[in-house]
Every structure is written in structure tokens, then in C-alpha cells.
Regions:
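Intrinsically disordered, low-complexity Ser/Thr-rich linker and spacer segments
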Residues: 1-3, 50-61
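Residues at alpha-helix boundaries and the short loops/turns that link adjacent helices
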Residues: 23, 35-38
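Cell-wall polysaccharide-cleaving catalytic domain and substrate-binding groove, primarily
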Residues: 13, 26, 33, 56-246, ...
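Disulfide-stabilized cysteine-rich extracellular repeat microdomains
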Residues: 9-11, 34-35, 46, 52
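Primarily a LysM-type cell-wall glycan-binding module
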Residues: 1-23, 45
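Residue-level detector of conserved, well-ordered beta-strand and adjacent loop positions
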Residues: 7, 30, 50, 172
Length: 384
């Protein structure tokens, strides 16, 4: 056991990286020192630091802890890391330590990693960070059930036409010639935790540019990634490994959660002429409804408002009647909405709409989501 005196600018994450390796678990330091809030460190505070341990190599990528031993290599690159495949398993060979990690599976043009860090676990070990984010219980409930339909905090996909997708909502780099949502997530990380951004991305030449708050572009060594040739670079296994490792950091995870719930600002609280001048937040107000709408927006963002408008028309009610009405009216709209969204958009309809809806509905039976009207409560007004 070692002892360390907290210095200005220290976080549990960077202390863990310094003493336990770059994938060191800050939660172990917190446990040993009885720290319940990971952002409550004080300059001069004495911490006990456990001795680093080398974990066994796991055999399945979906349960493999990618252990970042690249701390002494700045920047880590293909000289320090090589990649091999065994069947469909992608293995990172860390040449400075001899360690091998099965961290993903190959598919088509790239790879995928299911990840091991679940939002439900972060809700427990990251509770102090969630308090800092000022997340409401309703927002946490909605995030838990919708993230189950998407991915883990360290999930990666590089095989489809979006080039690189990351995290609980699988934010994408964007197709060739198009902006993507992943740069907006990284921009949020850069603004809130610049040291973490620099460690995981900036030191490798990554930056964000031309942001509009929702989408933007990545640049690599000063060059904006725009066309297919530019973005194809991000299919390289080294980038998947870097993003997977970043997705294991509690501060990066907290930004994912905040960025995910902030998606509601894009569509749920905004009045729409398609909805007769009302906002969805005035019409569908249960946690169940918000979870369904958010899940739809992640999958098919341009479909949500129109599909709800069609559900209202099908019900024979006006938006004003729904806004002033009872839970029965909301239940009717949801019923019609779920029927319509299975085919809304034709060939481009929501992926697995029925299965995703049932997954969310199951949370009602377990008491993790409320179907009651006005049960959804947002803290968006008090967040900075």
C-alpha cells in the first residue's frame, strides 16, 4: 500500500492511472479511503493507494477488460500496439508489456465491441458524479431503460456506414460528407473535463470543429474528417481501442449520461407546428412515454414528431384536448403511436420497434418506470 498527497488538479481517475496503470480502477481507491463522492478531493488530502495488479486475460470480447498499459507511451501508436485476429476475435498486442487483450470482434469493414460497463452500474458507483450533474430520478429512470436498447458505456462499432459509433447511445462520426453526433459528445467532454479529453483524444491529434450543439466534425492532426477516405481512418483498430478505454473512465461516462439526457432538449421541450403549436412535454408526460420517445429519437430522430402527430389524428382528439386531458388520453396516444411507429417511414422505419417498446414496458412491471401522467420530472432548468 502506498500513500499519496492530493495536488491541485488531481482527480481519482488520473491518480488511478498514475499509480495503477491507465486503466486503473479509481473505485478501488475510493473504497479504501471511504470516499463516497469522487469529485470531493481536497488539496493536501492523504490517500492510500493499493498496489497495482495484473488482471487475467479474459477470453470473450464482451466481458474482456481492456487494460490500458500505454501510460508511458506518448502517444501510443502502432509501434507500441499491434493487432491480430483469431477467427473473429480482434486481439490487441501491447508490445511494451507482452500483454494480449481480446477486446472486439471483426465484422464487415470494421469491428464491434458490446462493452462491459453498464449504465445501471454507473448509477451506483457514479452516484456522486450524477449529483454533480443534477440528474433527476425520472431522468435516471428514462436513461436506464433506453440505454438497455442501445449499448454499454464502452461499446464500439466501426463496421457500418457511420465509420465509428461509441457509447450508450452509439453516437456516430456521421456518414461520408455528413456531420455526426459523436463530435458533439467529445466537445462536451472537452468543455467539462479538458484534461480527460486531452489524455484520451487530444494527445493523438483529435479535435472537434464546426459544432452546432447537436452535430459537428472531428479533425485529426488539423485535418477535418469529411469524406469517406478521411473518415475511414477511424475504422482502424487503434481508434476502437482508444475509445473503448475512454469509455471505462468515470468522468467520460458521466458526460455520456448528461449528453444522452440532454437529447430531450432537441425535440421534447420544443413547440412544433406539426403538434398544433404544442411541445411533446405538454402532451406526453409519463416516464414511460418519455422513454419511448427518446428511444425512437435515438433510432430515427426525424420520425418522432410526425409519428406522434399521426397518432393524435388517429385518436380523434386535438393536441389541446390531450394537454388538458387525463391519463386515459395519454394512454390512447401511446397505444396509437406504438402501432404507427412500427411502419412509420416505410423501409426506413424504426429498427425493432416492437421489441424495443416491450423492453421499455417491462420496466413498468419491475417498478423502474412510471406510466402515470406527469410522472416525468426534468432538472434541465437547474443544470448549467
Amino acid at each position: 500500500m502506498q500513500e499519496y498527497i492530493v495536488q491541485a488538479g488531481d482527480t481519482l481517475s488520473n491518480i488511478a492511472r498514475r499509480f495503477l496503470g491507465a486503466n486503473g480502477d479509481w473505485r478501488e481507491i475510493a473504497r479504501i479511503n471511504n470516499i463516497t463522492n469522487p469529485v470531493s478531493l481536497q488539496i493536501g488530502q492523504r490517500l492510500l493507494i493499493p498496489n497495482p495488479a495484473t488482471p487475467p486475460i479474459a477470453q470473450n470480447p464482451e466481458v474482456a477488460m481492456v487494460r490500458n498499459t500505454l501510460q508511458g507511451v506518448h502517444p501510443p501508436n502502432k509501434i507500441a500496439i499491434s493487432f491480430t485476429t483469431v477467427g473473429s476475435d480482434l486481439i490487441a498486442n501491447l508490445l511494451n508489456t507482452g500483454q494480449q487483450e481480446r477486446f472486439a470482434k471483426t465484422k464487415d469493414l470494421g469491428l464491434y465491441r458490446f462493452g462491459i460497463f453498464k449504465l445501471r452500474d454507473f448509477i451506483i458507483y457514479g452516484s456522486g458524479l450524477l449529483q454533480q450533474l443534477q440528474m433527476s430520478p425520472s431522468e435516471i429512470n428514462v436513461m436506464l431503460v433506453t440505454s438497455a436498447n442501445e449499448g454499454s458505456l464502452d461499446a464500439i462499432n466501426t463496421w457500418d456506414n457511420q465509420y465509428l459509433s461509441f457509447g450508450i447511445f452509439q453516437w456516430t462520426l456521421g456518414s461520408a460528407g455528413q456531420a455526426g453526433e459523436l463530435p458533439a459528445l467529445l466537445s462536451n467532454l472537452k468543455r467539462r473535463y479538458p484534461t480527460e479529453f486531452q489524455y484520451y483524444f487530444g494527445q493523438f491529434g483529435v479535435d472537434t470543429i464546426s459544432m452546432d450543439g447537436v452535430t459537428g466534425w472531428l479533425s485529426l492532426n488539423g485535418k477535418q474528417l469529411v469524406n469517406a477516405a478521411d473518415k475511414n481512418i477511424m475504422r482502424q483498430p487503434i481508434w476502437a481501442l482508444r475509445f473503448a478505454i475512454a469509455g471505462m473512465d468515470a468522468l467520460v461516462q458521466s458526460v455520456q449520461v448528461l449528453h444522452a439526457v440532454s437529447r430531450l432538449d432537441q425535440f421534447y421541450f420544443r413547440p412544433s407546428q406539426t403538434l398544433q403549436g404544442f411541445a411533446l412535454s405538454q402532451l406526453l408526460t409519463s416516464e414511460f412515454a418519455v422513454a419511448l420517445l427518446l428511444d425512437h429519437h435515438v433510432n430515427r430522430p426525424s420520425h418522432v414528431i410526425g409519428c406522434v402527430a399521426d397518432a393524435i389524428a388517429r385518436s380523434g382528439l386535438t393536441a389541446a384536448q390531450i394537454a388538458q386531458g387525463s391519463g386515459d388520453n395519454e394512454a390512447l396516444i401511446i397505444q396509437n403511436y406504438l402501432i404507427l411507429r412500427e411502419t412509420y417511414g416505410g423501409a426506413n422505419a424504426m429498427t425493432k420497434s416492437r421489441e424495443r417498446a416491450e423492453s421499455i414496458r417491462n420496466a413498468i412491471a419491475t417498478g423502474n418506470l412510471s406510466p402515470q401522467r406527469f410522472s416525468f420530472r426534468s432538472n434541465r432548468q437547474v443544470r448549467v
